[in-house]
Amino acid sequence: MLTLIQGKKIVNDLRSRLAFEYNGQLIKILSKNIVAVGSLRREEKMLNDVDLLIIVPEKKLLKHVLPNIRIKDFSFSIKVCGERKCVLFIEWKKNTYQLDLFTALAEEKPYAVLHFTGPVSYLIRIRAALKKKNYKLNQYGLFKNQTLVPLKITTEKELIKELGFTYRIPKKRL
């Protein structure tokens, strides 16, 4: 367990240190492409882990980011890692914390931010209402009859409004 303040400090420390190896080169992950999600974004007082969403600029890089993740000046071990999710244990100020990393393409960002921020109860209500209209919402997009529904949105707030719901800041979601 860690406090919200500790979680925010860890994220600040990580922002300039995340990179991945690709074709023998170390590619820095830009701070603007790192989004705090989960209980940290909802500003819960106590956190079980730190959740970060990494926005990947090109589809061809997606399969390389998490399996080849590097954190400058941090000691870490990988519990499990795939193309879209990686669970790490990081050493920070003499303690070990769980860091969950997720990836999304730029066009998936609003959906992924909503999905990984939650909370689950909030997402269940939204998805249930959409299901009645034959839509499916997940971290990759909005679908109708298994076909992606293109929406001209770039933020989670725009997504919520486009779906016909009232936007609530993450810490006010139930």
From Swiss-Prot:
Query: Where are the disulfide bridges?
Result: C81-C86
Q: Identify its protein family.
A: Belongs to the DNA polymerase type-X family.
What lineage does the source organism belong to? Viruses, Varidnaviria, Bamfordvirae, Nucleocytoviricota, Pokkesviricetes
Among SUPFAM superfamilies, the record links this protein to: Nucleotidyltransferase
For this entry, the protein name equals Repair DNA polymerase X
Q: What binding details are noted for the cofactor?
A: In the presence of magnesium, pol X shows a strong preference for the ssDNA gaps having one and two nucleotides.
Q: What class of enzyme is it?
A: transferase
What function does this protein fulfil?
Error-prone polymerase lacking a proofreading 3'-5' exonuclease which catalyzes the gap-filling reaction during the DNA repair process. Specifically binds intermediates in the single-nucleotide base-excision repair process. Also catalyzes DNA polymerization with low nucleotide-insertion fidelity. Probably acts as a strategic DNA mutase, which gives rise to a rapid emergence of variants. Generates mismatched G-G pairs, in that case, the polymerase first binds the deoxynucleotide followed by mismatch formation.
Q: Which domain of life is it from?
A: Viruses
State the Gene Ontology BP annotations. Answer: double-strand break repair via nonhomologous end joining
Binding of Mg(2+): at which residues? D49, D51, D100
Q: Which cofactor does it need?
A: Mg(2+)
Where are the annotated segments for Involved in ssDNA binding?
42-51
Is the keyword Lipid biosynthesis in the record?
no
What is a single cellular component term in the Gene Ontology annotation?
virion component
Origin species: African swine fever virus (isolate Warthog/Namibia/Wart80/1980)
Further information: Consistent with its intracellular location, ASFV encodes its own replicative DNA polymerase and three base excision repair enzymes: a class II AP endonuclease, the repair polymerase Pol X, and an ATP-dependent DNA ligase.
Q: Where is it located? A: Virion
Q: Which GO terms describe its molecular function?
A: DNA binding; DNA-directed DNA polymerase activity; metal ion binding
Fill in the domain comment: Small DNA polymerase formed from only a palm and a C-terminal subdomain. The total DNA-binding site of pol X is composed of two DNA-binding subsites.
